[in-house]
Regions:
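Extended, folded domain segments that form the structural surfaces/walls around functional sites
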Residues: 58
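Short, solvent-exposed alpha-helical "recognition" segments
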Residues: 41-48
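Polyanion-binding surface elements
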Residues: 3-41, 61-63, 67-69
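Short Lys/Arg-enriched helix C-cap and helix-to-coil transition segments
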Residues: 48-54
Length: 71
């Protein structure tokens, strides 16, 4: 748990919100496979690795991406 706290404080700042995969999928409406395809093609913000099997996205980056999408 200490690694996550350190990562959060040093890299994203203490006030930045992190979203897990489930939240990103719910907010964007993308499927898991489409989301990762977009990440691979630099069409979506990169995820941050919080541990060996845990990733998260900066909420601000995802919201900015959503704002650029046509309605």
């Amino acid at each position: 748990m200490a690694n996550i706290e350190t990562y959060h404080a040093q890299v994203v700042g203490s006030d930045e919100e992190l979203w897990n995969l489930k939240t990103v999928i719910a907010r964007t409406g993308l499927s898991r496979s489409t989301l990762y395809a977009y990440v691979a093609r630099d069409l979506f913000p990169k995820q941050r690795h919080l541990g060996p099997r845990r990733v998260a996205w900066l909420a601000s980056e995802v919201l900015a991406w959503i704002a650029t999408r046509p309605n």
